[in-house]
Every structure is written in C-alpha cells, then in structure tokens.
C-alpha cells in the first residue's frame, strides 16, 4: 500500500487528475486502500474499480463511505444490479462508472447503460486481452458515435494511444502500467498529460507489421523477462553463449547426426535474413559448425545460431561477432554425409522447437517462444520488464527487494 501511495504522488506531480484504485489493490487491501488514498489525497478524485457484478447497492455504499468519488461496476451486470447501484450512488453522493470489459455486445450495451443513467461508461480492454493484441480505440470510436454519455477509456494506453483516445471521443483517459511500472513515474505521467492536452501536436507512431512489433519488443526485453512471462518456462537447458550478443529471430530447425555438418550448412541457404538456425546434433564431442559456416551465415543476414552439439574454430568464430549459443566447443569435426532434415519439429536444449518459433538469446541463455503465442508473450514480457524497471528504481532509492515486495506477507501458506 505504501508503494501505491508513493506512485500516486509521483503521478500527480506529472499531471494526473484522478487516482484509480485498481481491482487487485482493492482485493488485497480491501476498503482500507480507498481510505488510505483518500487520506493521502483529500483534494483528488478517487476512482474505486470495484468491478461489481452483484449486490450493487452494498458495494457502492462501501466504496463511498471509504472515500471514493467514482465507483466502477461491470457494465455486463444485470440491470437490477446497476439500477440499485445507481440508487446507492445518488444516496451517498458518488458517481457511477460502468465498465464494458468483456461485454458480449459492447455497442448495444452502451446504449442501454446510457438509458439506465450511469454517469460514465469505460471502454476497457483488459490486460489479458491486450496481450492478445486488442486495443480499445476502434471500439471507442464506434461507441462515441452512438451515445452522449461521458466516455472513459482504458487498456494499455501510452502517450501515443492516449492521443488517439482523445480524438476518438474519450473524456477520461485511464492509464495504468505505462505510468505505474515506469522507472520515472512523474515523467511518464507528464508525457501522457501533454499528449492529452495537445493531441494535435503529437505525431502518432505505428509499427508496420505484427512480426516487426514482436521483434522490436523482444529486442528490448531479456530472456529472463520472457521466461517469467511464460510462467518460468521456455528456457533451454545446457545451452550457453559462445559469442555474446542479443539474438532475436524466427527458427529454421535442423536435425542431424553426430558431427554431420551437411544439413546445418545447407540450412544457411534456406534461412532468410533475420532467422535463427537451431540445430540438434545429438553429440557434444564432434563439431557440426565452424568458422566457414559462420562466415556464410553472416553473408545471408542470419540473426544467430543455437546448437545442441559442438562448435569449433572458436578463435575465428569469436572475431566474426555472430551470436552463437552452444553446449560445447571442440577442435574436431565430422564429415558432410547429409543425414537428417531441415525445418521439422526438433528438441533442442530440452525445448520443443518448430520452424517459425521465435528464438531469443542473451547473456542468460536462450528461450523458445511458440509462434502461435509470440505476440501475446512478447507483450507479457514487456509488462514484466516495466515492472522490474520500477522495482530497480525503488531499490536505487535505498529499499531492498524483500521490503519493497513485502515478501513475508505474500509467502504461500
């Protein structure tokens, strides 16, 4: 709770008007979260994200008496719940915001919510939906043409998308992680404040393809961030950096026999610029890769190599700078007999790897991201990255990780 108050102070210094107490904080701290924020910020509008779906009157009363000015209920709740919540909001002098998160037909529902008399409707794409590539702007644009109720918007907004939200009709812009997870909360809030106040002065940036966005995110985050986002999974075992450097690319897979370097070298001609060649060679005592192959890979624009097996010509390979991750180095190689196959599913470092999976390597090792979940997991890794940046900032101020995260309180019992 102390961290939340400090973050709120820094956000206000950057220009934030309202303080939203999010659902996880309310669930962990109860109504005391609202009371604490009200005491700390007596002159600010306090928004309590209760996500009420039943007993609307009781939960609005609880939040109002704790100090909330605006209470959020789920827009998908039954009309009887919403009407009773409205009666309670009028009784206790607070405003009611209906949240459209996961509403089956949000455009139809917003018309009904306006007719019921709610004060605000929040066009909200949840965090898990954001990870799948959804954003609220298109929906907000459509809804703003149908109703006159005041519209709020939430869901992964930053300085860039906040501009689009204002232009699409939002009167309230709710920003979460892009402020609270920043290592400079005040500056992050200030940038968004400036975007909201002067939307025409901000140049809207866009990424041309999903693949490009995935690669840009993966270049920014670490393999540790990615493994955390995958619930501690995805990491190859026994694979270590030989030639250090960040590696991001899509997999071209090779299955071959001990020391047989025909298929690994042929894969260079099949791979495209930005691909990572992933090789399972079965034996760590005979090399299937060396200096000449590395030169060839550089000529094709290959992003890097992962080899469960051995590499040789280390003095030469290290000078070339191509990121290579392997399980061993030896001086001896085998012969190019041509056994094996290219671009079939393989197991490398204990991880299943399919052609097209995203492969990321750095100083910590290598992780495999299934292609079908690449966008989602890249976005989740970015959230882990932002959270850790915030923790680093708090540790730099003199705290310890255990104190900041209140580990004893949250140990599993």
Swiss-Prot record:
EC number(s) for this protein?
4.1.2.43
Query: Which segment of the chain is annotated as a signal peptide?
Result: none
Catalytic activity from the UniProt record: D-ribulose 5-phosphate + formaldehyde = D-arabino-hex-3-ulose 6-phosphate
Q: Which Pfam families match?
A: OMPdecase, RraA-like
What PANTHER family does the record tag this protein with? 3-KETO-L-GULONATE-6-PHOSPHATE DECARBOXYLASE SGBH-RELATED (PTHR35039:SF3)
Q: Name one GO molecular function term.
A: hexulose-6-phosphate synthase activity
Q: What is the lineage of its organism?
A: Archaea, Methanobacteriati, Methanobacteriota, Stenosarchaea group, Methanomicrobia
What is the name of this protein?
3-hexulose-6-phosphate synthase
Q: What does this protein do?
A: Catalyzes the condensation of ribulose 5-phosphate with formaldehyde to form 3-hexulose 6-phosphate.
Regarding protein family, the annotation reads: Belongs to the HPS/KGPDC family. HPS subfamily.
Superkingdom in the source lineage: Archaea
Tell me the keywords, alphabetical order: Carbohydrate metabolism, Lyase
Q: Which NCBIfam families match?
A: PRK07028.1, RuMP_HxlA
| UniProt KW Lyase keyword | yes
TM spans (from-to): none
Write the gene name: hpsA
Q: Does the keyword Lyase apply?
A: yes
Which processes are annotated in GO (biological process)?
'de novo' pyrimidine nucleobase biosynthetic process; L-ascorbic acid catabolic process
Give the organism, scientific name.
Methanosarcina barkeri (strain Fusaro / DSM 804)
């Amino acid at each position: 709770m102390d961290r939340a108050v400090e973050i709120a102070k820094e956000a206000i210094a950057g220009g934030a008007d309202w303080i939203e107490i999010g659902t996880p904080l309310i669930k962990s701290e109860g109504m005391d979260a609202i009371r604490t924020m009200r005491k700390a910020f007596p002159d600010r509008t306090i928004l309590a994200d209760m996500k009420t779906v039943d007993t609307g009157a009781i939960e609005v009363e609880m939040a109002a008496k704790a100090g909330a000015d605006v209470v959020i209920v789920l827009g998908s709740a039954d009309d009887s719940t919403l009407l009773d919540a409205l009666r309670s909001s009028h009784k206790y002098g607070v405003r009611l915001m209906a949240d459209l998160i996961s509403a089956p037909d949000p455009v139809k529902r917003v018309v009904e919510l306006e007719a019921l008399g709610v004060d605000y409707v929040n066009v909200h794409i949840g965090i898990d939906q954001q990870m799948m590539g959804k954003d609220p702007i298109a929906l907000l644009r459509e809804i703003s043409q149908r109703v006159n109720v005041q519209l709020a918007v939430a869901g992964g907004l930053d300085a860039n998308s906040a501009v689009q939200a204002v232009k699409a009709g939002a009167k309230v812009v709710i920003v979460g992680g892009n402020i609270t997870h920043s290592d400079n909360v005040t500056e992050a809030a200030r940038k968004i404040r400036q975007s909201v106040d002067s939307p025409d002065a901000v140049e809207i940036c866009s990424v041309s393809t999903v693949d490009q966005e995935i690669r840009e995110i993966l270049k920014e985050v670490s393999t540790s961030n990615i493994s955390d986002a995958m619930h501690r999974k995805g990491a190859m075992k026994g694979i270590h950096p030989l030639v250090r450097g960040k590696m991001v690319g899509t997999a071209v897979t090779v299955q071959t026999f001990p020391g047989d370097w025909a298929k690994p070298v042929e894969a260079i001609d099949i791979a495209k610029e930005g691909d990572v060649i992933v090789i399972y060679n079965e034996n760590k005592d005979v090399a299937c890769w060396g200096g000449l192959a590395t030169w060839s890979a550089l000529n094709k624009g290959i992003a890097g190599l992962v080899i469960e097996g051995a590499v040789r010509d280390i003095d030469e390979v290290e000078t070339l700078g191509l990121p290579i991750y392997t399980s061993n180095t030896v001086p001896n190689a085998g012969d190019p007999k041509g056994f094996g196959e290219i671009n079939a599913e393989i197991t490398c470092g204990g991880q299943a790897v399919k052609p097209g999976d995203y492969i990321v390597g750095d100083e910590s090792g290598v992780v495999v991201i299934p292609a079908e979940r690449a966008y989602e997991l890249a976005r989740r890794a970015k959230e882990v990255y932002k959270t850790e940046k915030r923790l680093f900032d708090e540790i730099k101020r003199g705290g310890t990780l255990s104190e900041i995260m209140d580990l004893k309180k949250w140990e599993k019992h």
